[in-house]
Amino acid sequence: MIKTIKSEYHSFICRSRMIILLAFAILVWQVVGSSLCNHAKMMEAGLQLFEPYIATANSYLVLLIVPIFALILMSDFPNLEDGYMFTIYRMGKTKWLIGKVIFALLCSFTIMAIVFVLSTIPCAGKISSGTKWSPATTKLAYYYPELTYNTVFNLIQRDIYNHIYPGIAAIHSILLTTLLIFGYSLMLLIGKIFNKKNLFMGIDVVLMAAGGILATIKHKAAFFFPAGNASLAGRYTEIGRTSNMPFYLSYIYMSVWIVLMLIVAFVGIKRLSLIHISEPTRHAQIS
C-alpha cells in the first residue's frame, strides 16, 4: 500500500496539470503580491513573514482562490484507469480506500505548502523580521485615509489583525484550509465509490461558493459551510473582542464533517461494484 501511495503521489507532483501553478503564481502576484510590496514601499517598512499568505488565503478580494486552485488539482481524484484495477484486486477494497484517504491527506498538505511558498516568494524582498503585523497592514489607512475603503488596500482586514497575531493566524488558516481541501477530496472519493462523481463535484462547488460568498459579506451563516469555517474572514468583529466563531468550534465542525464522510466512504466501499467505474464497456463486475 505504501509503495502505491508513493507512486501516485509522485505522479500527482509531476503531472502536467501542475502547469496551473504558473497561473496561480501570476494571479497571486498581480492581485496580492504587488499590492503588498507597494504598501510596504508607501510605509517604508517591511512585511511580516506570514502576511503574504494570509492576504492570499483570506482576503475578501480573492477569498476563494485557494479552494478553487485545490479543487482543480484534485478534480480527477481518485484516478481509476485500467492500470489501477489490478491494484484494487491485489490490495482489496478496504486497503485501497485507506490508501486513497492517506493520499488525499498528503496532497492537501502539499497544496497548502505550495500555496504558502507561491504567496511568499513574490514578496521575499520586502519581508523583515518580527512577529507582529507590519505597519503596511495596520497603519496604512491611518496615513492614507482616502484608501480606507479601497479593497486592494485592505487585503488583510481589521477584523483579523486587531484580534490575532500573524503567526497564529497563519497556523490556523493553513490547518483549517488543509482540512477543507481534504474534505472536498473525500467528497470526490465518495462520488467515485457511488458512481456519482459529477454530482459530488457539483456539491463541492456549491459548498465552496456558498461559504466563500457568505464569508466575503461577513454573514454569520458562512459558518454553516466548510469554506466559511476555513476562512479567517468574518471570524471577529472589527472592534472589541467578540468572536463570531471560535477556532475550536471550527475544528470540531471540520472533524465531524470529515468523520461522517469517512464513515460513508467505508460503508460504501463494502458495496462497491467496479463495473463501469472507469469505462462503461470495459470492466466486469467485481463484488
Describe the function of each predicted region.
Residues M1-F24:
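Aromatic- and glycine-rich beta-strand/loop motifs that create alpha-glucan
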Residues I5-K6, I13, T94-L105:
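Interfacial transmembrane-helix starts/ends
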Residues I72-Y89:
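Transmembrane helix boundary and interhelical loop/hinge segments in multi-pass membrane proteins
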Residues I275-S287:
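Single conserved hydrophobic/aromatic residue that forms the stacking wall/gate
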Residues V28-D76, I98, I102-I193, G228-M254:
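Secretory targeting signals
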Residues R17, G92-T94, K196-M201:
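Membrane-helix interface segments
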Residues F266-I275:
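Membrane-interface capping segments at transmembrane-helix boundaries
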